[in-house]
């Protein structure tokens, strides 16, 4: 059965390989299953996040081992998460293994250095992760990606490394990150500080196809057509439908929208709109109306 992560590898794929290896090697019983999630460092939850993000289904605890973002309903993007994602993964894997692991114990630990690989699955390309994360605002996926950036930069895969890791990755772009504070990969922390101009400059790189940023452009939700913008830019703003490509943002203290506008007159505009404070859902409509005005104005607004 497909989860929200379409065509991703499944535990059953791994279990089939393990059972095949066991059959070929005369193994009839698995006594112990050890779950190694040490790729990511603790804590699994950022101190400034509200636990309602977890119980209401917007964010899982950040562990390197979990199944379908630890969703109660793997087919629903927004679905309650638990406080035991690693243990849940172990439970599901034991079940997938079937009779051979019926009496196996399951515990968390670290992979021994002399271990032999008997089965493996590989994730989809990171480009697929990025596109899905952008389309539906998958917070868990965003946290994973941030930690992979940290690992690539030679840092620990932890909340404490994300700020430096992202700034280090942005160095070649020449974007000025002075004053930028990044507490997490998902943007859920209200202690993050990223000025709108920083996002606008980033979107300029996306528009121009800097490095491999084209994957970001391909993943941006489209006004009234896809992802988190599929139900927005209707009514009086319908003329902007299909012409605004942008990432949505929402926490209790703000709504944001940042991206690219293919304006009515053909001009490409980069924008970032923040509505901060004690905001209501109606702020999204106001943001959309302002972005639509940008679309209509086109080159009159361009500062280049």
What residue ranges belong to the model's regions?
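Solvent-exposed coil/turn segments that connect beta secondary-structure elements
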Residues: 1, 38-40, 51-52, 68-72, ...
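A small/polar active-site loop signature that marks catalytic segments
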Residues: 56, 71-217
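Short Gly/Pro-enriched turn/cap motifs at secondary-structure boundaries
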Residues: 54-56, 83, 247-251
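Structural recognition of the beta-strand scaffold that forms the well-ordered cores
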Residues: 32-35, 64-66, 132, 141-144, ...
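Small-residue-rich helix-loop
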Residues: 150-304
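Short, glycine/proline-biased beta-turn/loop segments that scaffold the active-site neighborhood
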Residues: 35-46, 50, 103-116, 222-224
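Envelope-exposed proteins and targeting segments
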Residues: 29-31, 59-63, 102, 141, ...
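Periplasmic/cell-envelope proteins involved in peptidoglycan metabolism and beta-lactam response
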Residues: 1-71, 289-292, 296-297
């Amino acid at each position: 059965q497909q989860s929200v992560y379409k065509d991703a590898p499944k535990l059953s794929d791994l279990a089939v390989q393990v059972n095949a290896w066991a059959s070929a090697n005369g193994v009839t019983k698995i006594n112990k299953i050890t779950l190694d999630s040490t790729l990511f460092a603790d804590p699994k939850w950022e101190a400034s996040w509200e636990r309602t993000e977890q119980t209401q289904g917007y964010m899982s605890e950040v562990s390197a081992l979990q199944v379908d973002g630890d969703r109660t309903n793997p087919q629903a993007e927004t679905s309650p998460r638990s406080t035991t994602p690693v243990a849940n993964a172990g439970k599901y894997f034991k079940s997938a293994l079937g009779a051979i692991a019926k009496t196996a114990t399951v515990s968390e630990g670290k992979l021994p250095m002399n271990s032999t690989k008997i089965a493996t699955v590989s994730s989809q390309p990171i480009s697929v992760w990025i596109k899905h994360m952008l389309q539906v605002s998958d917070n868990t996926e965003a946290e994973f990606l941030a930690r992979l950036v940290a690992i690539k930069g030679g840092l620990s895969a932890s909340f404490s490394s994300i700020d430096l890791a992202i700034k280090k990755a942005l160095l070649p772009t020449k974007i000025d990150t002075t004053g930028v504070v990044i507490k997490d990969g998902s943007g859920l922390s209200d202690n993050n500080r990223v000025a709108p101009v920083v996002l606008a400059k980033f979107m300029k790189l996306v528009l121009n196809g800097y490095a491999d940023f084209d994957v970001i452009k391909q993943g941006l939700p489209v006004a009234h057509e896809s992802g988190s913008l599929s139900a927005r830019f209707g009514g009086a703003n319908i003329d902007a439908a299909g012409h605004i490509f942008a990432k949505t943002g929402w926490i209790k203290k703000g709504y944001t929208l940042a991206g690219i506008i293919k304006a009515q007159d053909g001009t490409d505009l980069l924008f970032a709109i923040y509505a901060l404070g004690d905001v209501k859902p109606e702020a999204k409509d106001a943001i959309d109306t302002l972005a639509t005005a940008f679309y209509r104005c086109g080159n009159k607004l361009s500062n280049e």
